């Protein structure tokens, strides 16, 4: 370290002695000594300044080296990030295109369903018109039936009045019949009484006749005794007169008995005939009344059956009309609801398509911005190379679109702490083919190519219990199986996604399930997933096959599989490394 040269004390008048004039040589030496001292001080200051500058330069050089390393790492990270984002963008574009195609297919299906619904609606309208015509016919028939019913009711009322009259007549006739029966009983009793009297009279007559004969005999005996006394001349006359008198008495008595008997028989026969005639008249009247009553009852029953049939037909017509109206209202509601759902789905599809188009435009904007940034970086590096007069390193081409890449980083420590990054990109075109089949209500809708999830969907309109169901994933010779819980039910039209444990998704049953025992579903060139029910029968399967083809020329990659970005990395200070596709970063 330089130090200042001490200056000897100057002699002057203050030294305590008389001043002596200095010689010119002494003065020149003193001046030279003063100049050397000043130069020595300046040199010391300069050396200190140089040392401080060197120290600062070393610190700045270290900062520059660290900044260069950080910049290189940031550039490498930015490149990897750009590649990842570009791959994600490409994948998103592919997904968007696939989703757009799917949405277009669904839109076509929706249009076809809409046309079919319009046809069904037109058919339902024609059915409605036919039903309305039938309804009017039924109403006309119902009106005619109502008129007939009113007429039948009027006839029924009149017949009921006639029936009441006939019932009254029947009651009267029954009363007359009872009186006739009573009279007949009385006449029968009278007949019996008369017969008894006749029998008693006959017996009395016989008794009297016997007594009369006894009297005659007694008289005859008396007359014989008298005849003995009487003259024999008058005996013949007397006997003649006696016989004549007896004969007259007998005839008179027989005539009286015959007259009395004839009178009794005539009276009996007259009363019996009157009773018989009265009974016959009453019987005929009762029979006619009964016949009229039966006819009235039959007519009333027929009218009642007709009335009940008409009422049944009327109720059936009303029920049919109500059923048709309910069915028509239900069909209208279903058609309106289906049209509303389809319109809402179409609006959602349009919104999704618009959102996807917006996302696609944003991705294009991001891609253009990244291209502009890459171009700006390239121009900046070229300007730095021209300014530093560095030879440009060979450009490395990076292909991002389903490309397999391998990267090796080699770090060499030396005097300048340089890091060499070597990249090699092997571009390839990858085609993915999917095949799926299902024999039941549940199908395998999607298999994630990264092995994060598998999605199932219930395509039916009924809930599907999946207790004991098993899903098997096969990749080559390896296979894993996932079993559903006994209470799990997949709702109608619902999808369920089974995520791997490392997918970074939280469980949200019943639509999102986490397989905690499996970190990934696995990836490979040939992935096959089989769904089996609780009986072990295969109900659905889906396979994904990756086919890799290497193009003949690397320049065709941009057109066939992705976006090609040329990226040149240059060394900003020092001599560039002479390695293929490499750059040296300070």
From Swiss-Prot:
Gene Ontology cellular-component annotations: lamin filament; membrane; nuclear envelope; nuclear inner membrane; nuclear lamina; nuclear matrix; nuclear membrane; nucleoplasm
Q: Where is the composition biased (Low complexity)?
A: 390-409
- Region entry Coil 1A: which residue ranges? 35-69
Q: Where is this region: Coil 1B?
A: 82-215
Tell me if Phosphoprotein is a UniProt keyword of this record: yes
What GO terms in the biological process aspect are recorded for it? heterochromatin formation; nuclear envelope organization; nuclear migration; nuclear pore localization; protein localization to nuclear envelope
The chain residues annotated with the modification N-acetylalanine are 2
Tell me the keywords, alphabetical order.
Acetylation, Chromosomal rearrangement, Coiled coil, Disease variant, Disulfide bond, Glycoprotein, Intellectual disability, Intermediate filament, Isopeptide bond, Leukodystrophy, Lipoprotein, Methylation, Nucleus, Phosphoprotein, Prenylation, Primary microcephaly, Ubl conjugation
Domain LTD span(s) in chain numbering: 430-546
Q: Where is this cross-link: Glycyl lysine isopeptide (Lys-Gly) (interchain with G-Cter in SUMO2)?
A: 102, 123, 145, 157, 181, 241, 261, 271, 312, 330, 532, 547
Please describe, based on the UniProt annotation, the reported consequence of changing residue 29 to W: In ADLDTY; uncertain significance; no effect on localization to nuclear lamina
Q: List every position bearing Omega-N-methylarginine.
A: 14, 413
Q: Which InterPro entries match?
A: IF_conserved, IF_rod_dom, Lamin_tail_dom, Lamin_tail_dom_sf
Propeptide ranges are: 584-586
Question: Where is the motif named Nuclear localization signal mapped on this chain?
Answer: 415-420
* Positions where Cysteine methyl ester occurs in the chain: 583
Q: Which residues carry this modification: Phosphoserine?
A: 23, 28, 126, 158, 200, 210, 232, 278, 302, 375, 393, 534
Please describe the quaternary structure of this protein: Homodimer. Lamin dimers then assemble into dimeric head-to-tail polymers. Ultimately, two head-to-tail polymers assemble laterally into a protofilament with a uniformly shaped rod of 3.5 nm in diameter. Interacts with SPAG4 and SEPT12.
User: Any idea what this protein is called?
Assistant: Lamin-B1
Q: Which organism is it from?
A: Homo sapiens
């Amino acid at each position: 370290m330089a130090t200042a040269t001490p200056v000897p004390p100057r002699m002057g008048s203050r030294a305590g002695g008389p001043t002596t004039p200095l010689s010119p040589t002494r003065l020149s030496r003193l001046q030279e000594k003063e100049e050397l001292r000043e130069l020595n001080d300046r040199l010391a200051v300069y050396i200190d300044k140089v040392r401080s500058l060197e120290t600062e330069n070393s610190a700045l050089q270290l900062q520059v080296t660290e900044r260069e390393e950080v910049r290189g790492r940031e550039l490498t990270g930015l490149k990897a990030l750009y590649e990842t984002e570009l791959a994600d963008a490409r994948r998103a574009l592919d997904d968007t295109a696939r989703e757009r195609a799917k949405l277009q297919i669904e839109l076509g299906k929706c249009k076809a369903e809409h046309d079919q619904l319009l046809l069904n609606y037109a058919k339902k309208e024609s059915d409605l018109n036919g039903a309305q015509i039938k309804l009017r016919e039924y109403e006309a028939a119902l009106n005619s039936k109502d008129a007939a019913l009113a007429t039948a009711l009027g006839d029924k009322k009149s017949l009921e009045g006639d029936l009441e009259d006939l019932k009254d007549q029947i009651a009267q006739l029954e009363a007359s019949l009872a009186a006739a029966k009573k009279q007949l009983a009385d006449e029968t009793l009278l007949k019996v009484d008369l017969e008894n009297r006749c029998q008693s009279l006959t017996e009395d007559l016989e008794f009297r006749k016997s007594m009369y004969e006894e009297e005659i005999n007694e008289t005859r005996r008396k007359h014989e005794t008298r005849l003995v006394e009487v003259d024999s001349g008058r005996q013949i006359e007397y006997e003649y007169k006696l016989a004549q008198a007896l004969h007259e008495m007998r005839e008179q008595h027989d005539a009286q008995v015959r007259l009395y008997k004839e009178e009794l028989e005539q009276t009996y026969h007259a009363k019996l005939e009157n009773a018989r005639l009265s009974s016959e008249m009453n019987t005929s009247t009762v029979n006619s009344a009964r016949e009229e009553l039966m006819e009235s009852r039959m007519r009333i029953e027929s009218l009642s059956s007709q009335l009940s049939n008409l009422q049944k037909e009327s109720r059936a017509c009303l029920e049919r009309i109500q059923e048709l109206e309910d069915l028509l209202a239900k069909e209208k509601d279903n058609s309106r609801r289906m049209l509303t759902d389809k319109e809402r789905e179409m609006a959602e599809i349009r919104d999704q398509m618009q959102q996807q188009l917006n996302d696609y435009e944003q991705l294009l904007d991001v891609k253009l911005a990244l291209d502009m940034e890459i171009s700006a970086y390239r121009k900046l590096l070229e300007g730095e190379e021209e300014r530093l007069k560095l030879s440009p390193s060979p450009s490395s081409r990076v292909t991002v679109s389903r490309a397999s890449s391998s990267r090796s980083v080699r770090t060499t420590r030396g005097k300048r702490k340089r890091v060499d990054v070597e990249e090699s990109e092997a571009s390839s075109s990858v085609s993915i083919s999917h095949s799926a089949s299902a024999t039941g209500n549940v199908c395998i809708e999607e298999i994630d190519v990264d092995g994060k999830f598998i999605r199932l969907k219930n395509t039916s309109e009924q809930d599907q219990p999946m207790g004991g169901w098993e899903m098997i994933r096969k990749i080559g010779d390896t296979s894993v199986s996932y079993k559903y819980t006994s209470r799990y039910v997949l709702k109608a039209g619902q999808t369920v996604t089974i995520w791997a444990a490392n997918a970074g998704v939280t469980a949200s049953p019943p639509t999102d399930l986490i397989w905690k025992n499996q970190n990934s579903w696995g990836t490979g060139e040939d992935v096959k997933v089989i769904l089996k029910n609780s009986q072990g029968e295969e109900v659905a399967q889906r396979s994904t096959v990756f086919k890799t083809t290497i193009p003949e020329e690397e320049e065709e990659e941009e057109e066939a599989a992705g976006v090609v970005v040329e990226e040149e990395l240059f060394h900003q200070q020092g001599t560039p490394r002479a390695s293929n596709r490499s750059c040296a970063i300070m």
